[in-house]
Amino acid sequence: MVDNNAGVIIEGPLQDAEEGSVDKLLAINVNGVTLGARAAHPYLARTPGAQLLNMSSASAEYGQPQIAVYSASKFYVAGLTEALNLEWRKDDIRVVDVWPLWAKTDLVNGVKAKSLKRLGVRITPEQVAQAVWDAVHPKSRWAKGKVHHGVSKLDKALYLMKSLSPDRVAMCFARLIAG
């Protein structure tokens, strides 16, 4: 199993982003995960039952204002995960991701996004590690077919609501959370 994790965040309106900050975020969050997956493939392909786990974010459920580029980069990770899970099946490689909400890591230091203020930082690194473990050690056939994995009950509830709701309802809920 390879844990493919790369992420930085910039905050504020896109039009106010410092020169180079968007390029840096995309180089890390998008290119880092993509190139990490590509580099891991030959090793995974030689390992029966291999798995690639990408670290995404609950920000991939609906675009988040004030952290729009970060959110978009995590949408990319979710899409890459889905595509590679299909593409690499022929090589017996399962590809999944984990979507935590705000977790108690250095990534959130100094972040003032409304979604962070409204939801708080309740997820611990240990909870994320447990979600990673559970994602790569599925206990049922249903769980083995699952691609996206939440961490907390709230992550999972938000994902389910987004999956079952029309876009307008999901957008209203995202606005309520993120302002």
PLM feature spans:
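Conserved NAD(P)H cofactor-binding loop of Rossmann-fold oxidoreductase domains
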Residues: 5-10
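Substrate-binding pocket helix/loop in short-chain dehydrogenase/reductase
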Residues: 13-14, 18-26
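Active-site loop immediately N-terminal to the catalytic Tyr-X3-Lys motif
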Residues: 15, 64-68
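Active-site helix of classical SDR
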Residues: 37, 73
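Residue(s) in the substrate-gating loop at a strand-loop-helix junction
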Residues: 57
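Active-site-adjacent segment of SDR/Rossmann-fold oxidoreductases
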Residues: 62, 83-94
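C-terminal helical subdomain
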Residues: 97, 117-156
